[in-house]
């Protein structure tokens, strides 16, 4: 899996430039020639659209304007990648809902698997044209990590505009030292993350480390490297790392639990009492309506939501899971016994609000 940010593809005067993309394409070609399958997650559609209508939208404009630029630029982005390869390049656009909904998540995995079987090169981007602001994935670093787990990748390579992770931001601190090997993403390591230094993309070093943590939970190592350096990219094409290696977690969680932990969450939560919290955390139980005290948001049956403990100290997140009932229904059956559900609602989807198989503790 290769993730390429817009700062590596955007030309100084607007639009897309093949300057750095060529070297990255050679890295891709070297891996394909070695018999490896590869998927690209590529930003750059908005930057490409801005060149088509250079005075239309400024950086930081409302989302509808950025969506229009993404629609204009997506074809240009795919054309940029296609020019480097003889094999077909497949455009795959994903949204928050595609990864939050389990059935659509599995369908995306099947589609990507078939594209790879057919010898195509999938190029993935967030579908900025239709994503609404509150449901945007936010950055392609995290998208790349989730997709890396989805396709069961061996490694995630993140091309950036600096040489990897440093002990401090090298642009502002001359004493910053590069970190070649990161065995574990500790709080101290996360504190070293600085900004991207670019107004083109949305992901800084912090998001790259968050992505590495997501990939690591699936047993996938992450490599951060300077995509602007031809020497570094050529070394990578020869399997010689020049950058930062971030090790995978020692314990790989099961695929479904990974999805439950890392899929985008709906803007909502189920609120539970201390008894329910103890049953979930200590006994591995399912969540029953008797332990529910309320619901926040307007989620639907089948949505991924947070499960939060509400007590005298406030609220804190305990778990995530797939709700068997909508927020409206949960407010009606809260504090009720499971056998009362059908009498209250007129129907029942089962005795559990969230089944233990659809729940992961945080």
Swiss-Prot record:
Residues 267-348 form the PUA domain. The keyword rRNA-binding does not apply. It is an enzyme of class 2 (transferase). The keyword Amino-acid biosynthesis applies. Keywords: Amino-acid biosynthesis, ATP-binding, Cytoplasm, Kinase, Nucleotide-binding, Proline biosynthesis, Transferase. It catalyses: L-glutamate + ATP = L-glutamyl 5-phosphate + ADP. It is found in: Cytoplasm. It comes from the Bacteria. Its EC number is 2.7.2.11. GO terms for molecular function: ATP binding; glutamate 5-kinase activity; RNA binding. Disulfide bonds: none annotated. Pathway: Amino-acid biosynthesis; L-proline biosynthesis; L-glutamate 5-semialdehyde from L-glutamate: step 1/2. GO terms for biological process: L-proline biosynthetic process. PANTHER family: GLUTAMATE 5-KINASE, ISOPENTENYL PHOSPHATE KINASE. Catalyzes the transfer of a phosphate group to glutamate to form L-glutamate 5-phosphate. NCBIfam families: proB (TIGR01027). This is Glutamate 5-kinase. It comes from Xanthomonas oryzae pv. oryzae (strain KACC10331 / KXO85). The lineage of its organism: Bacteria, Pseudomonadati, Pseudomonadota, Gammaproteobacteria, Lysobacterales. The gene is proB.
